[in-house]
From Swiss-Prot:
The active site is at H265. It catalyses: a UDP-3-O-[(3R)-3-hydroxyacyl]-N-acetyl-alpha-D-glucosamine + H2O = a UDP-3-O-[(3R)-3-hydroxyacyl]-alpha-D-glucosamine + acetate. Zn(2+) binds at H79, H238, D242. Signal peptide: none annotated. Disulfide bonds: none annotated. It comes from Shewanella woodyi (strain ATCC 51908 / MS32). The lineage of its organism: Bacteria, Pseudomonadati, Pseudomonadota, Gammaproteobacteria, Alteromonadales. This is UDP-3-O-acyl-N-acetylglucosamine deacetylase. GO terms for cellular component: membrane. One of its GO terms (biological process) is lipid A biosynthetic process. Belongs to the LpxC family. GO terms for molecular function: metal ion binding; UDP-3-O-acyl-N-acetylglucosamine deacetylase activity. Its cofactor is Zn(2+). Pathway: Glycolipid biosynthesis; lipid IV(A) biosynthesis; lipid IV(A) from (3R)-3-hydroxytetradecanoyl-[acyl-carrier-protein] and UDP-N-acetyl-alpha-D-glucosamine: step 2/6.
Amino acid sequence: MIFQRTVKEMVKTTGVGLHSGNKVTLSIKPAPVNYGIVLVRTDLEPAVSIPAKADQVRETTMCTALVNDDGVRISTIEHLFAALAGLGIDNALIEVDAPEIPIMDGSASPWVFLLQSVGIQEQSAAKKYLRIKDTIRVEDGDKWAELKPFNGFRVDFAIDFNHPEIARSQQHMVMDFSTSAFVRDISRARTFGFMRDIEYLRANNLALGGSMENAVVLDEYKVLNPDGLRYEDEFVKHKILDAFGDLYVAGHAIVGEFCAFKTGHALNNQLVRALLAQQDAWELVSFEKDEAPVSFSVPAGAVFA
């Protein structure tokens, strides 16, 4: 049986909020089986809990944000959630003392390191996967995203940026998910932005914590970061990283193929909502270890500390 997972013990870190520029402290704590991922705003009195569910995603401009019925928000969850998804963590209590998750270096890599350093604990209940039975598709103009049946988790993703540096890079990628492939090929890809947008955002008191320490920054012609790119195709890989995080608010790892063209946070969330609403298009399944699709098989000692 493949079992549910949580962290072995509490781990804490500090960072900067991308939009506020303020210091943020975040803790990740173990949680019991079938708990899911729950985030808590500890800076409020009383503290406010928000479960990481698709219908709690109510803001998708520049990031993915959970917002409860009272308007309490936790923004920029996608990179942390990509790490949780990539390492197969089902249950965790995440406490944060600000309205946004710290941006760290703009990728999922610091979260992967944090989670692997504290260790991942198998629990005493079967892990449930969301298996796609029928194709679900959403569109917005020429942008689209779909989930369709596949025995594993495959991503087929394309971007289309009219920028010389991005156009020179590979803008299409197909990958079969595994934890090792995620950590090696996806987790280090950083968010990227354009100088012209950053100037506008800062004029509106946004992106105040953004810098070349936590983003790939481009002018009209080139990458401005002195050290350049981490991957030749870092742009499409970061969009895949975002999608991993955005899809994880489905509540379970997905068994299926995710295909997308020019999608972003809004369309990713629309896809998850459309999927969950069409209950005959999916089923929850568990696997014996020797029966699991290769995407979800865990090599001995690869993740658990």
